[in-house]
C-alpha cells in the first residue's frame, strides 16, 4: 500500500513540476506585431531591437521565427491572404511557446485606400473589420440591369437587403477604448511622404486624396480577391455600411484581417488571448479607384508606380510604434487592460 502511495505521489510531483516548467518556459508577450509580408515586418525589425528568435512550426517556411525584444515586444510575419494569415496565427497561438493571455495585438499592414477618405501614406485605425468576400456574386453582365453591381448578400433578393450574418466572421467590432487611445497617441505624428506619391495624388484634385498623409480613424474591408475600380469599391463602401447598420465607414481594403481576427476569436474562447486587446492599423499604399476622368484599369495595373508603397510601410512604424511603446513602456498600467486617461 505504501509503495502504491509513493508511486502516485511521485507521478503527481512529476506532472506538476513538468507543468510548472512548461509554464515558466513560455515567452510572455506584451505586444505582438502582426505583419503580412517581408517589408511590413522589416520596418519593425530595423527600428526596434527584436533579436530574440523563436522558431515556430507551421509559420511561413521563409520566415519561420517570431522576433522578440527584451521589452516583451514581438513581431510575426503571417504571409499574404486568408489562408496564410489563419494558418500562421493558429500555428503561433497553439504552439504554446508564448503566453498571450494579456498580449496586445497590433495587426499592421499596407492597403488600398479610398481617395475620398485618405491618400497614399494615410494611416487608418479601424473600429470595424468587414469581410467583402462573403457575398453572392453574379457577373455584372448577368445581373439585373437595375443592380449597381453583381454583388448581393447571401440568401437575399437584392443588393440593398442586409443578409443574416450566418458565417460569424462577416463583421468584427474592435474595442473602441483601445482604438481611440491608439489614435490619440498617433494623431500628431508627422508621417513620411515621397515625391512620386505627391505627384500621383495631385491628379485627384480633391482632399483628402491630394493632401499630405495623416492619421485617421476609418474601417477596413477584407477579401482574398484584390478588388479595385469605381463600381466594386462603391459596392464595398455600401456593403460595410450595410452590415454594420451604417456605423462603419470603410476606407481601406486588404486580404487578411478578418481571417486573422477569426483565429484570435477562437483562441479567446479557450482563454488563450483577449480580443479586447486587438488593434488594426492599415496604411494607404495605392488608391482603390481612379481620379476623375481616369482609368480604373490603369490605376490598378500601374499601382506600383504610384509611389505610395514606401511611405505606407514606413508609416506603419511611425503611427503604430506610438501604441507599441506606450504599452511596453508602461506595462504596469496596461497589464490589466486599457488604462483610463
Residue ranges and their predicted role:
Residues 6-14:
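Sec-dependent N-terminal signal peptides
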Residues 22-341:
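Accessory terminal and edge-of-domain segments that mediate assembly/interaction
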Amino acid at each position: 500500500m505504501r509503495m502504491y502511495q509513493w508511486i502516485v505521489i511521485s507521478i503527481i510531483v512529476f506532472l506538476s513540476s513538468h507543468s510548472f516548467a512548461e509554464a515558466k518556459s513560455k515567452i510572455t508577450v506584451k505586444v505582438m506585431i502582426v505583419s503580412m509580408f517581408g517589408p511590413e515586418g522589416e520596418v519593425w525589425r530595423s527600428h526596434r531591437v527584436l533579436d530574440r528568435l523563436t522558431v515556430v512550426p507551421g509559420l511561413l517556411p521563409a520566415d519561420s521565427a517570431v522576433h522578440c525584444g527584451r521589452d516583451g515586444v514581438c513581431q510575426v510575419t503571417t504571409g499574404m491572404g486568408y489562408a496564410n494569415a489563419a494558418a500562421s496565427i493558429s500555428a503561433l497561438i497553439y504552439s504554446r511557446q508564448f503566453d498571450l493571455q494579456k498580449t496586445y495585438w497590433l495587426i499592421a499592414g499596407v492597403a488600398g485606400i479610398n481617395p475620398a477618405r485618405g491618400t497614399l501614406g494615410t494611416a487608418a485605425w479601424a473600429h470595424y473589420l468587414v469581410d467583402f468576400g462573403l457575398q453572392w456574386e453574379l457577373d455584372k453582365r448577368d445581373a439585373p440591369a437595375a443592380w449597381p453591381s453583381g454583388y448581393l448578400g447571401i440568401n437575399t433578393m437584392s443588393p440593398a437587403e442586409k443578409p443574416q450574418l450566418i458565417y460569424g466572421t462577416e463583421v468584427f467590432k474592435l474595442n473602441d477604448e483601445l482604438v481611440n487611445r491608439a489614435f490619440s497617441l498617433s494623431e500628431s505624428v508627422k508621417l513620411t511622404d515621397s515625391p512620386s506619391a505627391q505627384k500621383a495624388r495631385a491628379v485627384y484634385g480633391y482632399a483628402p486624396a491630394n493632401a499630405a498623409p495623416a492619421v485617421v480613424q476609418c474601417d477596413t474591408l477584407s477579401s482574398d480577391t484584390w478588388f479595385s475600380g469605381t463600381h466594386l469599391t462603391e459596392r464595398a463602401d455600401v456593403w460595410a455600411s450595410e452590415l454594420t447598420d451604417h456605423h462603419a465607414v470603410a476606407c481601406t481594403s486588404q486580404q487578411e484581417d478578418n481571417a486573422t481576427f477569426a483565429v484570435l476569436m477562437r483562441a479567446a474562447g479557450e482563454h488563450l488571448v483577449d480580443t479586447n486587446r486587438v488593434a488594426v492599423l492599415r496604411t494607404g499604399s495605392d488608391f482603390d479607384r481612379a481620379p476623375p476622368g481616369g482609368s480604373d484599369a490603369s490605376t490598378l495595373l500601374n499601382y506600383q508606380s504610384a509611389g505610395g508603397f514606401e511611405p505606407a510601410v514606413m508609416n506603419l512604424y511611425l503611427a503604430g510604434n506610438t501604441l507599441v511603446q506606450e504599452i511596453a513602456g508602461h506595462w504596469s498600467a496596461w497589464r490589466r487592460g486599457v488604462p483610463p486617461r
